[in-house]
Swiss-Prot record:
It comes from Ruminiclostridium cellulolyticum (strain ATCC 35319 / DSM 5812 / JCM 6584 / H10) (Clostridium cellulolyticum). It comes from the Bacteria. InterPro entries: AICAR_Tfase_dup_dom_sf, Cytidine_deaminase-like, MGS-like_dom, MGS-like_dom_sf, PurH-like. SMART domains: AICARFT_IMPCHas, MGS. Keywords: Hydrolase, Multifunctional enzyme, Purine biosynthesis, Transferase. Belongs to the PurH family. The gene is purH. This is Bifunctional purine biosynthesis protein PurH. The lineage of its organism: Bacteria, Bacillati, Bacillota, Clostridia, Eubacteriales. Pfam families: AICARFT_IMPCHas (PF01808), MGS (PF02142). GO terms for molecular function: IMP cyclohydrolase activity; phosphoribosylaminoimidazolecarboxamide formyltransferase activity.
Amino acid sequence: MIKRALISVSDKTGIVEFASALASKGIEIISTGGTAKALSAAGLKVINISDITGFPECLDGRVKTLHPKVHAGLLAIRSNEEHMKQIKELGVETIDMVIINLYPFKQTILKGNVELEEAIENIDIGGPTMLRAAAKNYQDVAVIVDPADYKNVLNEMNESGDVSVKTKFRLAYKVFEHTSHYDTLIAKYLRDTLGDIDFPETLSLTYEKAQDMRYGENPHQKAVFYKEVGANTGLLPSAVQLHGKELSFNNINDTNGAIELVKEFDEPTVVAVKHTNPCGVGSADNIYDAYMRAYESDPVSIFGGIIAANREIDAKTAEEINKIFVEIVVAPSFTEDALAVLTQKKNVRLLKLENITDEISPDAYDMKKVAGGLLVQKYNSQLFNQEDLKCVTDVQPTKEQMEDLVFAMKVVKHTKSNAITLAKGKMTIGVGPGQTNRIVPTKVSIEYAGERSQGAVMASDAYFPFSDCVEAAAAAGIKAIIQPGGSIRDQESIDACNKYGIAMVFTGMRHFKH
């Protein structure tokens, strides 16, 4: 039976109503600081925590509840005769319910440009200590950390006169989930502030649920989408959905790939993605021409794909997009006329991502789950170092060819390895992704390109182990190649390029993607 409740909250949503309901059941209310003032102002009888401890709040409120009379009252096991004897001798009364939420550390650090001192002052000490104590003794203490639980707890109390052990256990779980999340945010903030710890000895990560899903990659798999706290605003979790049904697991995965690729480009660019691989990319002076280039790259594969643009979608572009079925269009904005066109189709999802061009931090973690472990690396934010670029052939690429080579390298960087991309006139004309050798994606991309390969350029995500890719490129009429270099047989590929009059540039930077 709940006789005494301790309330100390920073988020006062619904707390007066909840405390009033407790008081109406004859439950004694103990409180601290601002919470006590708010409850008293609402006409509730409140016992100040100082009256319980016999010790005043001090150090600007840093010490309020860190006292044996509080924690013994929380941790005493009611069925343990020795415990109950001890607290009686010590003059301690039990506390049966704790309602606490913590100092707003997350909200403080997310404001931007926060001073370290302010962040530190918003690290709660007494709150987590009481929460953990109450949760540890869940058999005897109901502990509430989430205002969303007020209603259910009251309903149960109204029906049965108490809170069941089953409910207390679930509430205790939420406490440890919450304090773990809270502490992880603090540790990450301090690590980021230090700035010299790339990979800590123990890695704690914390995310917040963004969306439940009907299923995962396949219908028999359960799934959910979590968002990173404080992530760059130019990433998918910050997108606003303007139209269409909720995004699926595969939608999110593919859209993320499209967003990451379109960030590589400064000029107006449209990216089309299927199964996380680009199937059409085009850059131009305006977004309409960029879309047409992306579409014409591969009019077959773009069907049912994801489209990402780094400029506002206008009505003219929307009309072209509407001629085919696409799953998603993500862009920094849409004109009203464009929305009127695109929303004619109920199955297309429209996402507005205002800061889609924002770069991803080079310090961001790129993680891959493996069975029993986690691979963590820094995000692949570089394309190449300008000083490492070198033409290794007799023939030098023209200015236009060099622009296309850089364009193609941006695309192949975001294509599953082993990958080859062909480009001409700032549009892809053939993409060969995800093969177990290098000659097959070369042939695949050439087959996609057809006659368009004449005069085109080629990009490879890794070095050529043999000269066979150059031979195939020459036969297709390709005039320039860009690749990392680094093979023990580089000279064979260089000799083949010289034989056929092909320019070849080494970047010195590999871009495997798995």
